[in-house]
Amino acid sequence: MAPAIKDGDLVIFYRYTSTDYLPQDVIVLEYEGQLQVRRVVATAGDTVDITGEGLVINGAVQQEPEIFQKTERYQNGVSFPLTVPEGQVFVLGDSRIGATDSRIYGCVKIEDTLGKVMTVIRRRSI
């Protein structure tokens, strides 16, 4: 997802029917009628917090070298810390500033996801 997926890029994803998403998987989901591509950062049973140090999963500050923006809470978003319920995942956009993700809408039910991204084909320069 970095650099960000842009209009015209082709996203190829596997229609995942399993419940085996793992942290760092990039998935496709639908939110308010819009397709989103988001990274799974926590799965069922994980505790998620966002502190002054950044993203914290199960008490450990996450090292995210591929993320160039600090992960921050949204003022009108979900309350932290939170524990991801069974059958759900917590997702974040790689472009953290202004991303609509689990900080806004909470955990995502796996049954509401469309699949796991396999590759992105950049078509902007074709």
Range-by-range predicted roles:
Residues A2-I126:
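Soluble "head" domains of membrane/secretory-pathway proteins
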